[in-house]
Amino acid sequence: MATPEVIVEIAALRKRFGTNEVLKGIDLSVTRGEVIAIIGKSGSGKSTLLRCVNGLEQFQEGTLTVDGQPLLYGNAAAMRALRQRVGMIFQGFNLFPHLSVGRNVMLAPTLVKKKANPDCTEQARKLLERVGLAEKFDAQPEQLSGGQQQRVAIARALAMEPAVLLCDEITSALDPELVGEVLRVVETLADEGMTLLMVTHEMNFARKVADRVVFMHAGRIHEVGPPEQVFGAPQTAELKQFLSALH
């Protein structure tokens, strides 16, 4: 059996904001097609870890490799290449309000990959169809619900054909009735073999979709394992307390 290909490799990663160390030696390997759910209290370092993976935050110690390429802050070309391999979706949808839905999806491939306009248009239509919004190509973002806007943001991230997709609490800004439609799109991506690294408060979703769940506490990974182990047989007092507080 072939060894799974490692897409994200994080080793001994430390990140400080001034004197406050928020990531205290993170080690994590993510293989192609794996879905990782990162859970933990606010302030445990979850979002900061994701922002380190795509180069939005600079870490002070350790190494981080994405799709075989080390993250090199001093090398502008390497950072541009990294950001093409890493898609990221945030809590806020961050769509450009003056551009149509289709143009939002087409923007990065047109500007960054220099794709021809007809190719980008066709790709954008296909991606919007994937997220269930084929009929919204010419709509303006303001005409969409929050759930629809977040699905456009997913399509936009996929337009760069990333090796890994980072999702940072992508349902936390949504009304409860809109959460399901976004999670269904993410579940479909997981089924199709997309490599996903997700910070989430949706525990049932993590239990259902994730291959492994990472529990972070106070800047460290306290536990990592399959959902049935992390949720069903927590090993540390911190995870037990975190899970009991959810009920």
Task: State the predicted function of each range.
Residues E5-P227:
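ABC family nucleotide-binding domain
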Residues H217-A218, V224, E228-H247:
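C-terminal boundary and immediately downstream tail of ABC-type ATPase nucleotide-binding domains
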